[in-house]
């Protein structure tokens, strides 16, 4: 089994990639996270687009550890906010990773926006960097922003994001399997599967 570093400390992201690999029948890779390797200096997320941030994180992880590395950068693009929060999604309220504060600010900004103008998309860019080269893919998940949070699954803006393909439920009301099948990150990770299969075969 060859190690594949997921350049994140978010265990939910690690579990999501593991489910995608299992569903695709990809074997021969052992997933490890940043918590499983020696600490290294991580570059700040300064890219203007998701792809830049994902690639920078994967490059840093590969350079520091020598392990094939996968990284993602994802966020929410809201039409009424001209595509924001975008790459600032995780720190929209000024506090990085404060899901409740970020969501509360988003809902406040959209308070007077009518339902027909609350369109939004989750976007995920995933990058794989290994000795064989670099691959970058992108997945999108269209929907709209609800008026109040619903559901207790997922993370981030999931409780206020109503996907177009979820029969009125928020992303936080979907099971992990349902979310994997249609989510932005699930779509991006599935696009990465052929490269991961090649990586597994090369090391098998």
UniProtKB/Swiss-Prot annotation:
Function, in words: Pyrophosphatase that catalyzes the hydrolysis of nucleoside triphosphates to their monophosphate derivatives, with a high preference for the non-canonical purine nucleotides XTP (xanthosine triphosphate), dITP (deoxyinosine triphosphate) and ITP. Seems to function as a house-cleaning enzyme that removes non-canonical purine nucleotides from the nucleotide pool, thus preventing their incorporation into DNA/RNA and avoiding chromosomal lesions.
Cite the record's note on assembly: Homodimer.
The name this protein goes by in its record? dITP/XTP pyrophosphatase
Its BP terms in the Gene Ontology are: nucleotide metabolic process; purine nucleoside triphosphate catabolic process
- Origin organism is Mycolicibacterium paratuberculosis (strain ATCC BAA-968 / K-10)
Gene3D superfamilies documented for this protein: 3.90.950.10
The annotated active site, in chain numbering, is: 73 (proton acceptor)
UniProt cross-references to NCBIfam families, sorted A to Z: RdgB/HAM1 family non-canonical purine NTP pyrophosphatase
Q: Where does Mg(2+) bind?
A: 73
Disulfide bridge map: none
Any matching Pfam family: Ham1p_like
What is a single cellular component term in the Gene Ontology annotation?
cytosol
User: Any binding details for the cofactor?
Assistant: Binds 1 Mg(2+) ion per subunit.
């Amino acid at each position: 089994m060859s190690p594949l570093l997921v350049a994140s400390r978010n265990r939910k992201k690690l579990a999501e990639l593991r489910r995608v690999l299992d569903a695709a029948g990809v074997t021969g890779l052992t997933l490890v996270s940043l918590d499983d390797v020696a600490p290294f200096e991580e570059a700040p997320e300064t890219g203007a687009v998701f792809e830049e941030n994902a690639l920078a994180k994967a490059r840093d992880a590969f350079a520091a550890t020598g392990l094939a590395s996968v990284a993602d950068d994802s966020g929410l693009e809201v039409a009424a906010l001209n595509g924001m929060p975008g790459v600032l999604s995780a720190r929209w309220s000024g506090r990085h990773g404060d899901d409740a504060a970020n969501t509360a600010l988003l809902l406040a900004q959209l308070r007077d926006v009518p339902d027909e103008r609350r369109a939004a998309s989750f976007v995920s860019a995933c990058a794989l960097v290994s000795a064989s080269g670099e691959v970058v893919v992108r997945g999108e998940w269209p929907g709209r922003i609800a008026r109040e949070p619903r559901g207790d699954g997922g993370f981030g803006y999931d409780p206020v994001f109503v996907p177009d393909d979820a029969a009125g439920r928020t992303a936080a009301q979907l099971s992990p399997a349902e979310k994997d099948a249609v989510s932005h990150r699930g779509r991006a990770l599935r696009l990465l599967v052929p490269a991961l299969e090649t990586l597994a075969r090369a090391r098998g």
